[in-house]
Structure formats: C-alpha cells, structure tokens
A protein has these predicted regions:
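SAM-dependent methyltransferase
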Residues: 155-226
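Conserved SAM-binding loop of SAM-dependent methyltransferases across substrates and taxa
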Residues: 58-71
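Conserved SAM-binding strand-loop segment of SAM-dependent methyltransferases
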Residues: 95-110
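A short glycine-rich, Lys/Arg-flanked "PGG" loop and its adjoining helix->strand segment in the class I
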Residues: 137-150
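Conserved class I S-adenosyl-L-methionine
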Residues: 47-57
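C-terminal lobe and adjacent flexible extensions of AdoMet/dcAdoMet transferase-like proteins
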Residues: 217-273
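A short acidic, Gly/Pro-enriched loop at the edge of an enzyme's catalytic core
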Residues: 111-121
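Conserved SAM-binding loop
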Residues: 87-88
Length: 273
C-alpha cells in the first residue's frame, strides 16, 4: 500500500506581510497625530490642517490625518515607489472619495521635493537619521523650513540614553507574533549604527531582517543646533514620561530641558518656524 503524502503546514513567516507587521508593531499614528495637533494648537492658538509626512513609507499617518477632518490635507513623501504602491493599495484605496482627493503620495527625495507649504512637516520613526553627515542634515532641515507656512511647525522624534550606544536586542510580545528590535552594530567614533527589525511567530518560524537601517545616532542637542542654523526660531523638547511605580514608559510626553540619566528614552523635537 502506498503511503499517503504528508503535506508540510505552511510557515507563518512565509504568509505574513512585513508592512502590516510594521504598522502594527512600530507605528502609533493616532497618538502621534494627537500630539502633533494638540502641541500645534497650544503653541499657535489654532488647529493645523495641512501635513507633509516625510519618509512616509506606507503613508499610514497621512491617511489617518485626512480621515480626522474634512478640511485636512496630507502629502506623503518617500523615495521608495514600491512601499508607496503598497501604501496606496492598502491604506489609500479604502478611503472615501473625498478623503482620496485630499491626500497625495509623492515618490520623491525629501531633499528635493517641492509640494507647497504646510502647517506641519513631520518625520517620525527616526527615519531622517538616514542622513549621517552634518551638512546633509542641515540641508534637510532647511528644506523643511522652506516647506512650512509662516507659523508652521516641524515635528521629529529621537531616542537616546546609555543603552542606545550598545548592541542589544529588545523583544515585545504582540498579538500573534514577537517583535524584535536589534541594534546590531555601533561605532562610537562615528555614531553610526546598524539596526534590524525581526519577527518571530508561534510556530517557531521567523522573519529575520524584515527591515534594516543604517543610521547615525544623533544627539538631541546637536539636532536642535542644526535646526537653529537652518532658520528655525525655536525648538522644544518633549520627553516620554515613565510610570512612577513600574518605571515603564507611558503615553505622555512632557516638555523639559533636563532628564535623569535614563537607560533609554524617546523624545519629540518640535521646531517652530
């Protein structure tokens, strides 16, 4: 009697979409846009309506922005046409016709793009750290400054702390998978770092190096100095707060000029034109 063939069960890692996993594990666009809108209103006394999302990837934030108010408009800029195509199919296509009319995705270089002027330009998830040379970062900040309306504000995020200067892995258990952030290499002479995002699944399969980054670990002070040189009138620093009892980070960012010697922290740099 012939033996029945045994069919291998498909590995979860072969079936998942890396972009969906990234959006679920890394991005928190609702909180980020709440922070942007609330901070802008507190500083300028009015609500922002136009946003340019730099290094937008799948444009999840831009899509969320146009859904919030019928007067909101967003432009997403990313040099990678493939990730923009994914974002259009999965994030833009489900929008209403009115919302689609108020969003535009541009496959362009943020150093060269000219898409008009905006209340807000934002670059989150540390994507702008791709620029490792001081002159290039200053040029980028100058381009952002030019892209803002007269009372516009730019928003950037940053991280730091003594653990940021070492190789390490951080694991987070999420619904159906494990997110792994790896700082794989760090050169203390140049502050260049190489980082990866991996995903691990309940069946033991893995999606290694789903996303790779070659960044410079910029300090908040040097970034603020560059923003001033680029023409920004004022910068503010908002650092994520920690729970007093658990020492775990919470969804609150406080404006400050001094923090303890944290092992790690995340901050927003807010630059006023």
């Amino acid at each position: 009697m012939a033996r029945s063939k045994q069919h291998k069960k498909p590995r979860i890692a072969d079936q998942v979409d890396p972009h969906e996993l990234y959006q679920e594990s890394v991005q928190g666009v609702e909180f980020e846009l709440d922070f942007v809108a609330d901070t802008f209103r507190a500083i300028r006394g009015r609500a922002p309506s136009t946003i340019r999302e730099d290094f937008c990837g799948t444009a999840l934030s831009a899509c969320e922005w146009v859904q919030r108010d019928r007067g909101n408009r967003a432009v997403g800029v990313d040099i990678d046409p493939d990730v923009l195509a994914w974002g259009y199919e999965h994030n833009v296509a489900p929008l209403t016709p009115s919302q689609k009319q108020r969003i535009e995705l541009l496959p362009e270089d943020v150093l060269e793009v000219d898409a008009g002027r905006f209340d807000v330009v934002q670059a989150f998830n540390f994507s702008y750290w791709f620029f490792q040379e001081r002159a290039t970062m200053k040029r980028y900040f100058e381009r952002v400054h030019d892209a803002l309306v007269d009372d516009g504000i730019a928003f950037f995020d940053a991280f730091g702390g003594y653990e940021a200067h070492r190789c390490q892995k951080e694991k987070s258990e999420l619904d159906g998978f494990t997110y792994i952030w790896e700082q794989a290499a760090y050169n203390p002479l140049s502050a260049e770092m190489i980082c990866f995002i991996h995903f691990r699944f309940p069946d033991g399969s893995r999606l290694d190096r789903a996303f790779s980054y070659n960044w410079r670990l910029w300090g908040a002070k040097e970034l603020r100095e560059l923003l001033a040189e680029a023409g920004f009138a004022r910068t503010r620093l908002y650092v994520q707060a920690f729970d007093d009892d658990t020492d775990e980070p919470i969804d609150r960012f406080d404006e400050t000029e001094e923090i303890p010697d944290y092992a790690s922290f995340i901050a927003y740099i807010v630059a006023e034109k």
